[in-house]
């Protein structure tokens, strides 16, 4: 019998031990994370946790004044000073939530909304200026030799920083207003069947909806320019040349979109676009004794989970009382995440909590419905766990999310400004008692979960891929290097049109010349014939 090389067992054990001890260091990398605060940060945290588990070092860079970003054991927190106090930050960024519940003239509300957005933009832009002009911090970041920047491009400052430091970048996002995600990836974006953000259109549009779909971005372009132009100016100042917002975004190696085609409509994609919808559903934990007790006390009726997201801390008293009245008319126990003033008519079946483990509760078999503002995190947690929704969209893409889920039969949408107590009561009874809502959301859940790779693993793979290969230039389309007229082949069309017109002109001239020659010769023959007859 043939025998191979025999390795002594102690040597083999020692070699294996060395391999295991060296391997993490050989593959470990340094990740600079520049997050967006709020719910955007919550799903990014899970990626950092997994990167840490795989031996990578993550440094989270954030202003010292923020909402949710605090030191944790799986990343290093680096903060920088800004000129805003915590009170000013809360007033400008969080102090506008009452606006969502106020009924007033459209123009008045529009201008108030614009003022609110301007204040928020001012906070983030000022923070960006102070970051990029912090020479000591920039030198430290440069010296650290990061392998990749992970950021949400809604924060254009981080994209400018990554480009300035010449570090490969991975974008982690849901979408960017004004179609900047399409422009930044050079992804085809026909308005004929791809609904624009904030239009609430579906992918099957009537003629007038297609008109709206085409005009809406044009109407928003001025607003978008006003908010994005300061970052382009800042980048131009840093690079000492003209830099556009699209130039800044095109630096990204990979785009990780927190979406998929269970929730979103089919659309073209580019090679460096990866879809990780439902990434926030990855880690479900056992419920605490407190919440288990609430569920056990609910009996056969089960529970309803109610949360309007991290940005809404209080609701106007009249609206809160109308909601409390409706909640008191259903047999289920309602767990309501609410930090505002307790409604005086709150029923015994409604429990107010300052925080709740939303995904863990939605995963419990006794959960019957989910009242949500239709933020993408909540909608995906509802899809993952198969819980029908009553949706109260408040701002941004929440209206689009609610429309999509309602179209798919997974829930009911209410206008939070116009709804009455009876409307909410009827909507809750519909999604709880009508089996079609549960069947539809379970079908979406089945489609969403039927995938070869979990979203969290996919996201981590691509971050590591960019670290290993120092970017992903082979996925970058050449469209980034074309001018607008080259991209649309207008120069080729113009050239071909000129050739066709030239050929047509020469052909016409030749025909005209030949015609004149033939006609002239024929005329001379006729004249000669007439002269002979005379």
Swiss-Prot record:
Coiled-coil ranges from the UniProt annotation: none
Membrane-topology descriptor: Single-pass membrane protein
Alphabetical keyword list: Endoplasmic reticulum, Glycoprotein, Glycosyltransferase, Lipid metabolism, Membrane, Signal, Transferase, Transmembrane, Transmembrane helix
First-level EC class: transferase
Catalysis: reaction(s): glucuronate acceptor + UDP-alpha-D-glucuronate = acceptor beta-D-glucuronoside + UDP + H(+); 17beta-estradiol + UDP-alpha-D-glucuronate = 17beta-estradiol 3-O-(beta-D-glucuronate) + UDP + H(+); 17beta-estradiol + UDP-alpha-D-glucuronate = 17beta-estradiol 17-O-(beta-D-glucuronate) + UDP + H(+); 17alpha-estradiol + UDP-alpha-D-glucuronate = 17alpha-estradiol 3-O-(beta-D-glucuronate) + UDP + H(+)
UniProt-listed InterPro entries: UDP-glycosyltransferase, UDP_glucos_trans, UDP_glycos_trans_CS
Signal peptide: 1-28
Alphabetical list of Pfam families matching this protein: UDPGT
Subcellular location: Endoplasmic reticulum membrane
GO BP terms: bile acid secretion; estrogen metabolic process; flavonoid metabolic process; negative regulation of fatty acid metabolic process; retinoic acid metabolic process; vitamin D3 metabolic process; xenobiotic metabolic process
Enzyme Commission numbers on file: 2.4.1.17
Domain of life from the UniProt record: Eukaryota
Membrane-spanning ranges: 492-508
Residues listed as glycosylation sites in the UniProt record: 119, 142, 296, 348
Transferase as UniProt keyword: yes
GO molecular function: enzyme binding; enzyme inhibitor activity; glucuronosyltransferase activity; protein heterodimerization activity; protein homodimerization activity; retinoic acid binding
GO cellular component entries: endoplasmic reticulum; endoplasmic reticulum membrane
Note: UGT1A3 isoform is part of the UGT1A complex locus which displays alternative use of promoters, first exons and terminal exons. The locus is defined by 13 first exons, which are alternatively spliced to 3 other common exons and 2 alternative terminal exons 5. From the 27 possible mRNA isoforms, 9 produce functionally active polypeptides (UGT1A1, 1A3, 1A4, 1A5, 1A6, 1A7, 1A8, 1A9 and 1A10) called isoforms 1 (i1). Use of an alternative exon 5 (5b) as terminal exon is leading to 9 additional alternatively spliced products termed isoforms i2 and which lack transferase activity.
Oligomer and partners: Homodimer. Homooligomer. Interacts with UGT1A1, UGT1A4, UGT1A6, UGT1A7, UGT1A8, UGT1A9 and UGT1A10 to form heterodimers. Isoform 1 interacts with isoform 2/i2 suggesting that oligomerization is involved in negative regulation of transferase activity by isoform 2. Isoform 1 also interacts with respective i2 isoforms of UGT1A1, UGT1A4, UGT1A6, UGT1A7, UGT1A8, UGT1A9 and UGT1A10.
Family designation: Belongs to the UDP-glycosyltransferase family.
Name this polypeptide is given: UDP-glucuronosyltransferase 1A3
Source organism (scientific name): Homo sapiens
Organism phylogeny: Eukaryota, Metazoa, Chordata, Craniata, Vertebrata
Gene assigned in the entry: UGT1A3
């Amino acid at each position: 019998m043939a025998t191979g090389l025999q390795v002594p067992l102690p040597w083999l054990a020692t070699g294996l031990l060395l391999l295991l001890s060296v391997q993490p260091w050989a593959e470990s990398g340094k990740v600079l994370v520049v997050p967006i605060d709020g719910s955007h940060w919550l799903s990014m945290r899970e990626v950092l946790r997994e990167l840490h588990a795989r031996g990578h070092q993550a440094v989270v860079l954030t202003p010292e004044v923020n909402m949710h970003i605090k030191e944790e054991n799986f990343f290093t927190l680096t903060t920088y000073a800004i000129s805003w106090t915590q009170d000013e930050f809360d007033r400008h960024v969080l102090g506008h939530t009452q606006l969502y519940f106020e009924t007033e003239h459209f123009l008045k509300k529009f201008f108030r909304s614009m003022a609110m957005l301007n204040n928020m933009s001012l906070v983030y832009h000022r923070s960006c200026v102070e970051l990029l002009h912090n020479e000591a911090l920039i030198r430290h970041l440069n010296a650290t030799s990061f392998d990749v920047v992970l950021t949400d491009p809604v924060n254009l400052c981080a994209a400018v920083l990554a480009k300035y430091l010449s570090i490969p970048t991975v974008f982690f996002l849901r979408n960017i207003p004004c179609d900047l995600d399409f422009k930044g990836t050079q992804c085809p974006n026909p308005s004929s069947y791809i609904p624009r953000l904030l239009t609430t259109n579906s992918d099957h549009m009537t003629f007038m909806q297609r008109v709206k779909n085409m005009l809406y971005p044009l109407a928003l372009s001025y607003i978008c320019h006003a908010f994005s132009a300061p970052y382009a100016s800042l980048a131009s100042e840093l690079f000492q040349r003209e830099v556009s917002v699209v130039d800044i975004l095109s630096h990204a190696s990979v785009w990780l979109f927190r979406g998929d085609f269970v929730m979103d409509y089919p659309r073209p994609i580019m090679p460096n676009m990866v879809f990780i919808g439902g990434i926030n559903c990855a880690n479900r934990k056992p419920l605490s004794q407190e919440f288990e007790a609430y569920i056990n006390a609910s009996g056969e009726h089960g529970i309803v989970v109610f949360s309007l997201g991290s940005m809404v801390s209080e609701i106007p008293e009249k609206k809160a009382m109308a909601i409390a009245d409706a909640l008191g008319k259903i047999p289920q126990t309602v767990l309501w995440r609410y930090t505002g003033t307790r409604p005086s008519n709150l029923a015994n079946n409604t429990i107010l909590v300052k925080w709740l483990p939303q995904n863990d509760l939605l995963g419990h078999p006794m959960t019957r419905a989910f009242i949500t503002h239709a933020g993408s995190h909540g909608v995906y947690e509802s899809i993952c766990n198969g819980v029908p929704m009553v949706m109260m969209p408040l701002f941004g893409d929440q209206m689009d999310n609610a429309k999509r889920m309602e179209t798919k039969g997974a829930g009911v949408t209410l206008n939070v400004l116009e709804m009455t107590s009876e409307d909410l009561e009827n909507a809750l009874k519909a999604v709880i008692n009508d089996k079609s809502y549960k069947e539809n959301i379970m079908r979406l859940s089945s489609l969403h979960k039927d995938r070869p790779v979990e979203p969290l693993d996919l996201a981590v793979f691509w971050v590591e891929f960019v670290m290993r290969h120092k970017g992903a230039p082979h996925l970058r389309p050449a469209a980034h290097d074309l001018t607008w007229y080259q991209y649309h082949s207008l120069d080729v069309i113009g050239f071909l049109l000129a050739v066709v017109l030239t050929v047509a002109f020469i052909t016409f001239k030749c025909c005209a010349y030949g015609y004149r020659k033939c006609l002239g010769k024929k005329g001379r023959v006729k004249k000669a014939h007439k002269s002979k007859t005379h």
